Amino acid sequence: MMKLNRREETLPLPPTPYVVSDSGQFDGNDGKWSTFSINIGDVDSGQGQNFRVLISTSSPVTIVPGATEWCDSDCARTRGVEIYNGQQPRGIEQSAQWKLAGIYKMPEPHWWNESYRIDQSNTTGVWGVDNVGLGTTSIQSPILGEQYVVETLVEDYFMGSFGLAAGETGPSGGSKPNFIDNFYASHQIASKSYGYTAGAHYRK
């Protein structure tokens, strides 16, 4: 009787889930919710610009506040703009990696309608591509290059947001895979699925 030996073969394990801790602060457009830290413009040096942002399950892009006349430095802090190079900026400061794409309409949340509008200017933003990292800037932060970042100047988008929608987005003829697609393609996560809890201040 032939004896079959078990073939020794090691199958690669899928990547473990990547866990992003909340910022430890509560911010929001319509209340106080858990925010999460992201960094923009880093090149594995720990010198990126940090932002506290809300999570958007319907948005495909990263949206962050830009400097505007109606929001001073104290206001910018409440919009999630963190201290950068020892100073409080009023919005995103374009990094050496920033590439301008143009001014286009911002993606609106699935629940949005005109009755929510508080700013009568149009909802366009300055689109560009830059490096986007998870968590506060550090040499351990996972960073993806060539990600769409939208700079918003309108009060309707008071806080920035980190989009988790899968697929591609961008101006006509300039679509790029979204962050979660690129994160999956770089073998840093096992699938394009995610779990998320929006902690509220009153439930502390």
Report the location of each language-model feature:
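Signature of the N-terminal lobe/flap region of pepsin-like aspartyl proteases
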Residues: V20, G28-Q147
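Aspartyl protease catalytic domain
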Residues: M1-N29, G133-K204
